[in-house]
A protein has these predicted regions:
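Contiguous, glycine/small-aliphatic-enriched amphipathic segments in soluble metabolic enzymes
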Residues: 1-142, 183, 187-272, 276-291, ...
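Small-molecule pocket liners
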Residues: 38, 141, 157-158, 167-169
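A broad structural signal for alpha-helix termini and local helix breaks/kinks
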Residues: 54-55, 148-152, 175, 204
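Short, flexible loop segments at boundaries between secondary-structure elements
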Residues: 146-158, 162-166, 294-310
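Ligand-binding beta-strand-loop-alpha-helix segment within the catalytic cores
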Residues: 161-191
């Protein structure tokens, strides 16, 4: 079987969150819209219990190999089992589930590295629960990079939030705001610019991506009066990127970077910290937004929301972002494979 016939590998996420809900709802949506075949690396009993809570009739089929999932997908939701997951109560996360959560992520990476899956799509995890169990990585992005680089040179993963109308990249991700100025460097910003440009070319078909880089300080530093990061760090990174032939503008004041007219001038915005990128993105594209990790040797996407424990099992969770994540993962893998 070529990659075209392989399923997407969908991870378990935190089983007490809305991952099971949106997985079930995404599969049921296949009769109304195009959903690329996927296999959930998880637990059939947890899915069946959540389906009962939601009043859904969903046939669930366990498979021993991912290759069986594509043929099964039209009739049943394929599940590749993970070991060691006990009973799960919706909305009540437990550290006891962490080994199964990690196993699901590791299995997904292994499948895509072996060519048994086209891409990795991850359901939401709870960082607080993982940290409580001794998880040493800030989040999914860093863990996936560690798994992917286990046998080679370290990777530099880049988190991009993508929708049809807006793409944003935070240079720093899951760190306290007070640490951002200290951690920003010319080389870090330049690496994010280069990896973003490469990803836009490879996976999204942009021949010469236009990148807009935000400043860190109000008014992009007001020529040094409100901070020197723009002069000492950000502008040198932009100049280095331009010297390599990249189309990069900035540093721009962040407060005027996201209105409609400004968005028409670039293909992706490079921002200095998490909320500078994600607040405008989630305001403009919450349900259709997808989290993409660039800089990995495989495609990875996820919904752009969290575990939403309070919604688990209530029927109020929307599968839209997961559906868009599945579709984008499929489209990106086709582009990378030269089939689109």
């Amino acid at each position: 079987m070529g990659l075209a016939g392989c399923p997407l590998a969908l991870t378990l996420g935190d089983p007490a969150g809305i991952g099971p809900d949106i997985t079930l709802l995404a599969w049921t949506a296949r009769t109304r819209e195009t959903i690329p075949p996927f296999v959930l690396i998880g637990d059939a009993a947890v899915l069946a219990e959540r389906a009962r809570a939601l009043g859904l009739t969903v046939p669930i089929g366990e498979v021993s190999e991912a290759s069986a999932a594509t043929g099964l997908f039209p009739q049943a939701l394929p599940v590749l089992p993970v070991a060691g997951l006990g009973p799960v109560m919706a909305g009540r996360p437990e550290e006891a589930a962490v080994p199964a959560v990690k196993q699901s992520i590791e299995r997904a990476v292994s499948l895509v590295q072996k060519g048994a899956a086209r891409a990795v799509v991850t359901n939401p995890i709870s960082k607080a629960v993982l940290y409580g169990a001794g998880f040493p990585f800030p989040g999914h992005t860093e863990y996936l990079a560690a798994l992917a680089s286990a046998k080679g040179a370290p990777l530099h993963p880049v988190m991009m939030l993508a929708s049809p109308t807006l793409k944003v990249v935070p240079v720093t991700i899951h760190i306290p705001l007070k640490d951002v100025p200290r951690l920003l460097t010319r080389d870090l910003i330049l690496a994010n610019i280069e990896i973003t440009a490469s990803g836009l070319r490879r996976y999204f078909g942009f021949k010469r991506p236009r990148l807009a880089v935000s400043g860190l300080n109000p008014h992009a530093g007001e020529e040094g009066r409100l901070g020197r990061e723009e002069i000492d760090i950000i502008m040198p990174a932009i100049e280095a990127a331009r010297a390599k032939g990249l189309d990069v503008s900035g540093p721009h004041p962040a407060d005027t970077l996201f209105h409609a007219s400004a968005r028409s001038t670039y293909d992706a915005a490079i921002c200095m910290y998490h909320d500078q990128a994600l607040v405008p993105f989630k305001t403009l594209a919450f349900e259709e937004g997808v989290n993409v990790t660039l800089g990995l040797p495989f495609v990875r996407t996820s919904p752009d929301h969290g575990t939403a424990f309070r919604l688990a099992g209530t029927g109020k969770a929307s599968p839209r972002s997961l559906i868009e994540a599945l579709r984008l993962a499929s489209a990106m893998s086709e582009k990378a494979e030269g089939r689109a």
